[in-house]
């Protein structure tokens, strides 16, 4: 509960409407807040099956440039990595997206820094991670490749050169407000191949604005995720015994501003 309260304080900073910007301005600000039953990232639970409160703030320009920040409570720093204190993830990212010709293709390139403030013994590898990415989208489909440029990758040392490839689809069901999704990804850890795994997900999300204007910006969803990760390498340390790559079903509610 303490971790959730801390996350609520932080994400509450972005849970207010952005400053007024003229409708025809090239500058756009947006924010979002999410409550989820489990924070699952690329198939791996970041909260050990516990709930998370998350929030983000984004700026975009008509040219295609964007930047933003996002935060969530996490549990794996203490329960898996060996941190003596640490229960937050804070991300900062920037990139550029745009159209390719008239074929309906959309590209997105950028970089993201994952930061995990906290205390850890000197023999524990820091969790902070630097990633660059490139994505190509067409209609309902997206292919995204992420490459890690930091020496440490989510707590694994000497792992620069690790990468993650994902293929996903997001299909709206007519004008119902329902969107069905599916994805598959594969994570390869340089010099840490025992940690390699594939993950997959199926999901459904519903735009509550279809129910009434009072719910504009609210989305509810459910997702099922699973991996082929080795439990010997992805299970929390004693006294916790949660396999972080286990199959799980999550539900969430998001409010966008």
Language model: regions and residue ranges:
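Cleavable N-terminal export/targeting peptides
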Residues: 1-28
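Short glycine/proline- and aromatic-enriched beta-strand/turn motifs that initiate or cap beta-hairpins
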Residues: 23-75
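Membrane-embedded beta-strand positions of outer-membrane beta-barrel proteins
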Residues: 31-33, 57, 67-69, 94, ...
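Surface-exposed loop and membrane-interface regions of Gram-negative outer-membrane beta-barrel proteins
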Residues: 45, 62-126
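Transmembrane beta-strands of outer-membrane beta-barrel pores
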Residues: 35-41, 61, 71-75, 98, ...
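Residues that define the transmembrane beta-barrel architecture of outer-membrane proteins
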Residues: 27, 49-53, 86-90, 105, ...
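Short loop/turn motifs that connect adjacent beta-strands in outer-membrane beta-barrel proteins
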Residues: 21-28, 64-67, 99-106, 171-180, ...
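Outer-membrane beta-barrel "beta-signal"
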Residues: 202, 206-208, 241-257
